[in-house]
């Protein structure tokens, strides 16, 4: 994922960033180091607390950023209802997860629904960082799911930067390319 992080260094100062499925808040820390104000959302209190520690370890004040515990789909709806918008939305879900509110999430079948739920929160001209390590989701299917969600939301993709699997994630015959990452600018 390191190949994607430097993109936060351009244009992140003063940006509002939503990191859904934040885990230990790696994307949030990188965005905050570049001057963004972040909102980290995750279903695990344990990992959000770890994320707060990562902010502190990186000389960032975690109290200047938001950490939201709860179901991502539920919170995407809540934030949209409150008309919250972000300059950058990061979607890097686990391949599989389960919550009481939303039930089962599988990246292979639900990535498009995730993008559809997140797009109302993305400002016009904003950037969507979409990533998955779901081996069963082919790159063309991943991009098609995102494109279908954008079209349904009447959001034109004006720029696309696909990041191939980096060298620190070796590709072998037994383990083909599974990491897919794309940066999209949407009108």
For each predicted feature, which ranges?
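Conserved SAM-binding loop of SAM-dependent methyltransferases across substrates and taxa
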Residues: 24-36
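S-adenosyl-L-methionine
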Residues: 44-90
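Conserved class I S-adenosyl-L-methionine
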Residues: 13-23
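SAM-dependent Rossmann-like transferase core, predominantly class I methyltransferases
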Residues: 1-15
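Conserved SAM-binding motif I beta-strand of class I
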Residues: 37-43
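Mobile active-site "lid"/loop adjacent to the S-adenosyl-L-methionine
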Residues: 86-117
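Helix-to-beta-strand junctions that scaffold the AdoMet/dcAdoMet cofactor pocket
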Residues: 122-124
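C-terminal catalytic and target-recognition region of SAM-dependent MTase-like enzymes
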Residues: 127-187
